[in-house]
Amino acid sequence: MLEKLIKNFATYMGITSTLELDADGAYVLPISEVVKVRAQQNADNEIVLSASLGALPPSADTAKLYLQMMIGNLFGRETGGSALGLDSEGNVVMVRRFSGDTTYDDFVRHVESFMNFSETWLSDLGLGKQ
């Protein structure tokens, strides 16, 4: 199901290159110069979108930024239903899961919303300026 959604989405976005799976089995969607969105299907048949937003700046007040992320995560209101966290290397990541049985129109809405919230958080946390 995901492969068909991805191919239709790539056509919709005007992506002419062939989308292939990365080493983790995820499609990397080249739809933004700033944020690369990965899409894959998990064992529970959910589609998982993820994006690495980068490392916090060395001069950052990490306690303040972690609090900002926690508040943003509360009820998904400031993340569009996604979750912010840190990966094993300390980079800020955003993740969103939804049913793999989604319609194409809903898939497009999920991806576009995820991109918008990812780019907003990238800016709000001062990432990508290093």
UniProtKB/Swiss-Prot annotation:
It comes from Chlamydia pneumoniae (Chlamydophila pneumoniae). Belongs to the chlamydial CPn_0713/CT_663/TC_0034 family. This is Protein CPn_0713/CP_0033/CPj0713/CpB0740. It comes from the Bacteria. GO terms for biological process: protein secretion by the type III secretion system. Coiled coil: none annotated. InterPro entries: Tir_chaperone (IPR010261).
